[in-house]
């Protein structure tokens, strides 16, 4: 794959586009929102600076071209990645529009956070070329990418996707079953559910919970995955503790009131200046810069 088109320039699009361009792909990008198209250049530049800090080889052949016209953006593409909002009908609509504009062998990849790929491809005319390509945020720093074949995805599409990801220096992980949330978000949301339950019960403050996780299990899991950690701790220890603890853990199927109350007030986090914590524009810039620096340092340490 040499020519990529990224559809959507919100949270994920700029970092994805910058990563692909850095790997030598010709990249075009599209967003229906003129404001996002205008702002995208800042995202490309910020991502490129981080990739330089990571010493990722710069194979860029040209700058990323931003379009306000979808057909112009996908012209000649052999890979199209959609990063539009998490709405099944919208994703299907986008792919249906693109199908009429690209060659038959162009791969259609979705960066959905958890909608089963089989459900997305079922609404398309050419489901065999539809595949999940779930990046983590920030996509230009976190190297793991989930590759999710739907029930109708052709094996060759999976192979091509894995090869393309490896050329970017990222790490492709093939998900064997197309379950909602795939793997990363199923694990993450299980952790989030328990964390929110502990805060709601008054067991711990949000600040102390963040410190506890970051400097406790988060610190370990950056180096040793959960299954390897079981072996290191001892399966007998897990069996003993899990025997009494598992039944005490949250198994709620709804979203915590702690979250719903805030979202109803449009307290959405960084994007609104208020969420769990309060943010000023200056604090947001400082937090994002610090996050990038620390994630770069962690990636370098793990790759050493």
What is each residue range found by the language model?
Residues 32-35, 49-108, 115:
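Rossmann-like NAD(P)-binding element
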Residues 1-50:
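NAD(P)+-binding Rossmann beta1-loop-alpha1 motif at the extreme N-terminus of oxidoreductases
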Residues 107-185:
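Rossmann-fold dinucleotide-binding core
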Residues 33, 154, 204-208:
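Helix N-cap / loop-to-helix initiation motif
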Residues 28, 67, 81, 131-133, ...:
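Hydrophobic/aromatic beta-strand patches that form the interior of the parallel beta-sheet core
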């Amino acid at each position: 794959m040499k020519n990529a088109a990224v559809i959507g320039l919100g949270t994920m699009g700029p970092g994805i586009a910058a990563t692909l361009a850095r790997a030598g792909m010709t990249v075009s990008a599209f967003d229906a929102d003129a404001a996002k198209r205008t702002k995208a250049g800042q995202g490309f530049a910020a991502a490129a600076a981080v990739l330089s800090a990571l010493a990722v080889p710069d194979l860029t052949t040209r700058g990323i071209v931003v379009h306000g016209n979808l057909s112009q953006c996908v012209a000649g593409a052999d890979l199209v990645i959609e990063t539009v909002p998490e709405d099944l009908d919208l994703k299907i609509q986008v792919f249906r529009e693109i199908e009429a504009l690209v060659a038959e062998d162009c791969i259609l990849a979705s960066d959905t956070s958890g909608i089963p790929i089989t459900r997305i491809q079922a609404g398309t005319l050419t489901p065999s070329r539809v595949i999940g390509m779930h990046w983590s945020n920030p996509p230009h720093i976190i190297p793991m990418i989930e590759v999710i074949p739907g029930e109708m995805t052709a094996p060759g599409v999976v192979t091509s996707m894995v090869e393309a990801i490896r050329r970017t220096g990222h790490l492709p992980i093939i998900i064997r079953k197309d379950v909602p949330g795939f793997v990363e978000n199923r694990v993450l949301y299980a952790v989030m559910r328990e964390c929110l339950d502990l805060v709601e019960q008054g067991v711990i403050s949000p600040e102390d919970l963040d410190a506890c996780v970051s400097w406790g299990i988060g610190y370990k899991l950056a180096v040793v995955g959960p299954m390897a950690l079981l072996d290191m701790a001892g399966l007998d220890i897990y069996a003993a503790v899990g025997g009494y603890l598992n039944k005490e853990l949250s198994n709620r199927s709804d979203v915590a009131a702690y979250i719903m109350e805030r979202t109803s007030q449009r307290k959405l986090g960084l994007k609104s200046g208020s969420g769990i914590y309060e943010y000023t524009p200056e604090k947001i810039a400082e937090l994002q810069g610090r996050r990038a620096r620390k994630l770069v340092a962690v990636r370098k340490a793990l790759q050493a």
